[in-house]
Amino acid sequence: MAVGKNKRLTKGGKKGAKKKIVDPFSKKDWYDVKAPAMFNIRNLGKTLVTRTQGTKIASDGLKGRVFEVSLADLQNDEVAFRKFKLITEDVQGKNCLTNFHGMDLTRDKMCSMVKKWQTMIEAHVDVKTTDGYLLRLFCVGFTKKRNNQIRKTSYAQHQQVRQIRKKMMEIMTREVQTNDLKEVVNKLIPDSIGKDIEKACQSIYPLHDVYVRKVKMLKKPKFELGKLMELHGEGGGAGKPAGDETGAKVERADGYEPPVQESV
């Protein structure tokens, strides 16, 4: 066996040398996430995306990004069992403009409502809004004791359950079909649809804890920047002329344009 040093290791080549550690955050930028004008608190927070490099544009990585936010954070409220999903539809400068993408109840709220000695009634329906959004709404309700009832249980008969389910579907269809997405979201925030169902079903069987527990977005119309700007109210309206011009420029080159302006 030949005695001597291994030339490959002593040169400081592949095996001996350490790789240079590059901080991944040095190539990323922070963008503000803006909620539509239906909500009291418009600034949701920030999101990270890799900077524009060559053909890979930063705004393309942000479009379609979904944020799940508690209604308590959107309305500055203490009731925090409703969660809204907001999807990024356009990027204006350093702002991500979002739109409604769905709603859900928290797991702990759903579990707290399901109890013994009562009937749980569920219904779901697919409805189209006036502006072309196809939504699937899920509703849930629970029977409760009548006034002066001595019996421990409050079970509804199968026929009553069917009547209540029919009523739920009718009210959900009516409330969504006659309104656009903005008005539907305004009804989901205080859950006025659930309260209407509770009132309408009193004559069939008394109900409590009636909620639209989930809303799914099934289909959307073709994206229009003007409509998204309307949803974002004052911010969108004020920046509308500039928004149409700068929106396209920012998408093409995030880090290239400012230095050119300075030199001019």
From Swiss-Prot:
Domain of life: Eukaryota
Annotated Pfam families: Ribosomal_S3Ae (PF01015)
Mitochondrion in keyword set: no
Gene Ontology BP annotations: ribosomal small subunit biogenesis; translation
Region (Disordered) residue spans: 233-264
GO cellular component: cytosolic small ribosomal subunit; nucleolus; small-subunit processome
UniProt xrefs under SMART domains: Ribosomal_S3Ae (SM01397)
Keywords on record: Cytoplasm, Nucleus, Ribonucleoprotein, Ribosomal protein
Molecular function GO labels: structural constituent of ribosome
Biased composition (Basic and acidic residues): 242-255
Coiled coil: none
Main function: Component of the small ribosomal subunit. The ribosome is a large ribonucleoprotein complex responsible for the synthesis of proteins in the cell. Part of the small subunit (SSU) processome, first precursor of the small eukaryotic ribosomal subunit. During the assembly of the SSU processome in the nucleolus, many ribosome biogenesis factors, an RNA chaperone and ribosomal proteins associate with the nascent pre-rRNA and work in concert to generate RNA folding, modifications, rearrangements and cleavage as well as targeted degradation of pre-ribosomal RNA by the RNA exosome.
Subunit structure, interactors included: Component of the small ribosomal subunit. Mature ribosomes consist of a small (40S) and a large (60S) subunit. The 40S subunit contains about 33 different proteins and 1 molecule of RNA (18S). The 60S subunit contains about 49 different proteins and 3 molecules of RNA (28S, 5.8S and 5S). Part of the small subunit (SSU) processome, composed of more than 70 proteins and the RNA chaperone small nucleolar RNA (snoRNA) U3.
Family label: Belongs to the eukaryotic ribosomal protein eS1 family.
Name assigned to this protein: Small ribosomal subunit protein eS1
Protein species of origin: Xenopus tropicalis (Western clawed frog)
